Amino acid sequence: MDNKRYGHFDDQHREYVITDPKTPWPWINYLGNEDFFSLISNTAGGYSFYKDAKFRRITRYRYNNVPMDNGGRYFYINDNGCVWNPGWKPCKTPLDFYECRHGMSYTRITGCKNGVEASVLFFVPLKTLAEVQKLTLKNTTGEVKKLKLFSFEEWCLWNAATDMENFQRNFSTGEVEIEGSTIYHKTEYRERRNHYAFYHVNTEIQGYDTDRETFIGLYNEFANPDAVMEGKPRNSHAHGWSPIASHYIEVELKPGEEKDFIFLLGYVENEQDKKFVAPKVINKEKAYAIIEKLNTTEKVDKAFAELCQYWDALLNIYNVRTGNDKLDRMVNIWNQYQCMVTFNFSRSASFFESGVGRGMGFRDSNQDLVGFVHQIPPRARQRIIDIASTQFPDGGCYHQYQPLTKRGNNDIGGGFNDDPCWLIFGTVAYIKETGDFSILDEMVPFDNQPGSEVTLFEHLKISMDHVIKNLGPHMLPLIGRADWNDCLNLNCFSWDPNESFQTTENVSEGTKAESLMIAGLFVVTGKDYVALCNKIEELKNGKIENFNSSTLKSFNFSTEAARMQQAVDAMIDAVKKHGWDGEWYLRAYDFYGRKIGSNECDEAKIFIESQGWCTMAEIGAEDGMVAKSLDSCKKYLECEHGMVLNNPAFSKYIYEYGEISSYPEGYKENAGIFCHNNPWVIIGECLAGRGNDAWSHYAKILPSYVEEKYQTLHKVEPYVNCQMVAGKDAFRPGEGKNSWLTGTAAWMWYTVSEFILGIKPDYDGIRIDPCLPETASDYTVSRKFREAEYEITIHPNGAQKGIKQIVLDGKAIDGAIIPYSAGKHVVEVTM
């Protein structure tokens, strides 16, 4: 397949530049950093929402539509009968020039046609509940241009799920108000809702439309709205049906003249007793304040500069210079940016996730923390509290929670037995980054129930105990509904296509099927828990000022560390005895006690998840198990585009295994390349000192390398990781799916920053422990850590692993940890 190119990286401006609107799939970006968010494609498709893409959807979007990516924030330009859009869609009029620049929380789309240049800057200003759309029109001809400009947004009726189904109600609820150049969407505001949205432009308008059928025409499309094609607004007022917001502006441009138009899509919540200023007239005071804040080009430019400065600061916390542009751009820009997005959205809203079916995942959000905690630690801290608040008293937890309410999702429930361990993983990462042990003293409820509060540390303790209390016949962890692999449903037994694999239970009640993946995870997080307990005991004597809880002050952390170490040792013994297949670790035992992921199996003889976690746990390393497992990954799982999840693929549905065997060969969990778990094996390679293999695996799924070789085949955005790449058994190996919202982002960051480049936050400072390919050159990492700034230069000298000497501020130090102290420091590391 020819590798047609649709764009390129612009590292200086931290942008990806798309030069052809007809990308193989919509290539999107995310706007907003907190509360107000938007998804925007390279042709301005997408939608906006407040906090929760399900319950506070502001604008409408139709997934899997024909044509693809139809609907968004559109500007129609009628130039003497020639109608076009700056982003090509929806009219798809051929443009003389097109460019989309996706940057850090902003997108700029530029189109030119017949001597008119239209450029739109889209962004959400910091701490503002509005999306700015700054449209600049420029006349590049020697003649006067008279243009008819139409804006367009289609309102969603708030709940994105019922918006797509409850039409017997929806067609009768839509309400709007029009005041000057602002169109207000107030559907259902009269009753239980206290929120509305608005669409404003900072100039006088010559007309408007708020009824979709009137504006477009019942049998027309976004590509040919009646009002636009005829150049005449209808001044329609929506009463039910489908409300929209469209401004009509007559624009005259002299030769060489350009004009700015500031459009604002905003969201407002009012206090219950301040909803109206007169009967049926909404209180617009907060909307006026947003408009006043952003009603001129100068104000918008200032807000945009502040956003850019915000990202400058975030991306200067960790910066590497290796001389390898492909590596540097991913580490310094796009990987960290994607980590922010996954932290904000978990797996809820992308062009593959509709924002309706999933909220914030317990497992997902804890993993996302390791890619984000260095950027904004206070937000990471609050996220940990929110996650722990959805835990149950027995240590189990809701699998997901809604971002708007922060309450557990009853539709999914719990019973995914890996979930509790991830709370230790996320919390330890936070404390190592910040040194803030006081988080362990926070009083956190169970299931968000008032009066049930215990310290966060007690939540960690019962998380570990949940695994210990749920062991199977081989003393390995029970899998429950599933472990990390939501599609390995060993207690489901479903023949009914109308039921969910994840939520269907059979009579076994999950008391037999066991997971080697959870076993490895338990050992890794158990070691972290033991080290945390020992560190607390070391610091307890007056050195942790904020430990106010009598429970924690009187708790014997040394005894707890010893207790948990025994449990970890027992798990290691169980894995060695019952989890080793000769060349690799087993994946699981099914309900009947049969091996899964064994050479004895007809298909799916080896799985990546247990190889990753058991090698990360270094189980049996002294007996050669880790090395054999890693060799088996390379021999049986690796292919041109990464490592597949299992091999060979399932060729038929096996009801004892569940959803995993329902996929065609090479896709998703059935031998697809799940990019999320490739880093687990890479970390195992790093811990084993195998830098050449670690780098080889890493580069295969690094977007900048994929972009260079497989831009057309890969299909999805070339600047971020995707969840899944079609495996070697697929019809089209190398094709990507499920981009953006994937744990791959955090794991790629964690892997490269801490294990390959080797800069690891620790309780007492920064641990230096790189694992590099033999070809690696000298490199420098600038790392802000708490109140310190470190300039760390690594001299590999051809070594893959091992430190000969560390020189801190001109003096050699013992050990591999740079002791923390505030201020600026220069570090030289010789391998």
Language model features with spans:
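Active-site lining segments that contact anionic ligands and/or coordinate catalytic metals
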Residues: 104-106, 244-248, 258, 609-611, ...
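Beta-rich accessory regions
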Residues: 126-150, 193-198, 202-212, 254-260, ...
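Anionic coordination/interaction segments
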Residues: 1-364, 378, 383-386, 429-433, ...
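Conserved hydrophobic/aromatic pocket- or pore-lining residues that grip, position, or stack substrates
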Residues: 334, 368, 614
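Aromatic-rich carbohydrate-recognition surfaces in CAZymes
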Residues: 78, 360, 364-365, 369-380, ...
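Active-site acid/base region of carbohydrate-active enzymes
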Residues: 319-333, 378, 382, 387-396, ...
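Catalytic cores of carbohydrate-active enzymes
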Residues: 150-152, 167, 398-400, 521-548, ...
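Solvent-exposed loop and edge beta-strand segments that line ligand/cofactor-binding
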Residues: 350-365, 408-417, 501-519, 594-617, ...
